[in-house]
Amino acid sequence: MNTLYTLFATCPRGLETVLSQELESLGCTDVQVFDGGVSCRGGLEQVYAANLHSRTASRILLRLTKGTYRNERDIYKLAKNINWFNWFTLQQTFKVKVEAKRANVKSIQFVGLTVKDAVCDAFRDIYDARPSVDKAAPDVRIHAFLNERNVEIFIDTSGEALFKRGYRLDTGEAPLRENLAAGLLLSAGYDGTQPFQDPFCGSGTIAIEAAWIAARRAPGMMRRFGFEKLQNFDKTLWSDLRRRAEAQTRPVRAPIAGSDNDRRIVQTALDNARRAGVDDIVSFSVADAQSVRPNGENGIMVSNPPYGVRLEEVRALQALYPQLGTWLKKHYAGWLAAMFTGDREMPKFMCLSPKRKIPLYNGNIDCRLFLIDMVEGSNR
């Protein structure tokens, strides 16, 4: 019998709609968008497929229970009533993380200890022993979410966060997480059939994610997952899903290029591309952005140009933006330029009018993805 679970997939804020489309395409049902994630229903196949195939999710959480509470004692009872031994063994380690929004509790840390005690006591009642906690590298991660009246307890099927694809060991000074980079590409309409460029490529994350989209490469192929350590792990199903994922890859026809004016960071991008298995697909070079020229017609540029945090940085960059606008208008007619930035004034200083402004967060930084159709001459 195929048990259906209630799932919650977390993602960078602003990518919830893109993630919901991914989950629907993987066969999830009852898909609902919330701030910071998407809830849905699915069986083990959808759990495994979401971890393997979602480009934008951060974690796939599986709900074990939901209830109301008045105090920490209610949370303890709810957590202790879960059949934890159906999910992991006494010999495995675990960790509890609690998140709350307007919760009626004295301390989030105390709720974490309460859930931890409930798990340990549930095991102790059966085995007269308790599993150990490992905060650094647990076998099993448990998440509790509280609001004013309700508590939900989940088991994390992902393990390490899904943006950890396995190819990026070295990071640039301001690395863009892989799932956010993929989300920028999908939000811009990139599907791998158009020429692609990133003239501010940094450590290459956007270009590498573009190559994986173009090759139909599942982003989870290089890593392990939390669900592989759970008691209900179906090895046959997982092997079949991986085999199908390998069979769906395709040759990349359209060119993909990244460039940066920092030789050291371009070397990092080359190393990352090699580990990602796309060094024969992505062309990286050392170049000042304004010396770069299109690698085809009607392409897509997705880039995270430098933007300032301190006032003097902002002023220096805002002097550069008009030059970038002139360069784009002169050389990139027919292209879509998707600029991701924390500087909402960027298009104005570039003298360009975006057709769409998509609010997104890079960590805690409130950013915008500006989609600009490039036409010859002035675009204002």
Swiss-Prot record:
The keyword Cytoplasm applies. It catalyses: guanosine(2445) in 23S rRNA + S-adenosyl-L-methionine = N(2)-methylguanosine(2445) in 23S rRNA + S-adenosyl-L-homocysteine + H(+). The gene is rlmL. Belongs to the methyltransferase superfamily. Keywords: Cytoplasm, Methyltransferase, RNA-binding, rRNA processing, S-adenosyl-L-methionine, Transferase. GO terms for biological process: tRNA methylation. Its EC number is 2.1.1.173. Gene3D superfamilies: 3.30.2130.30, Vaccinia Virus protein VP39. One of its GO terms (molecular function) is 23S rRNA (guanine(2445)-N(2))-methyltransferase activity. This is Ribosomal RNA large subunit methyltransferase L. Residues 46-157 form the THUMP domain. It is found in: Cytoplasm. GO terms for cellular component: cytoplasm. InterPro entries: DNA_methylase_N6_adenine_CS, RlmKL-like_Mtase, RlmKL-like_Mtase_CS, RlmL_1st, SAM-dependent_MTases_sf, THUMP_dom. Its main location: cytoplasm. It comes from Neisseria meningitidis serogroup B (strain ATCC BAA-335 / MC58). Transmembrane segments: none annotated. The lineage of its organism: Bacteria, Pseudomonadati, Pseudomonadota, Betaproteobacteria, Neisseriales.
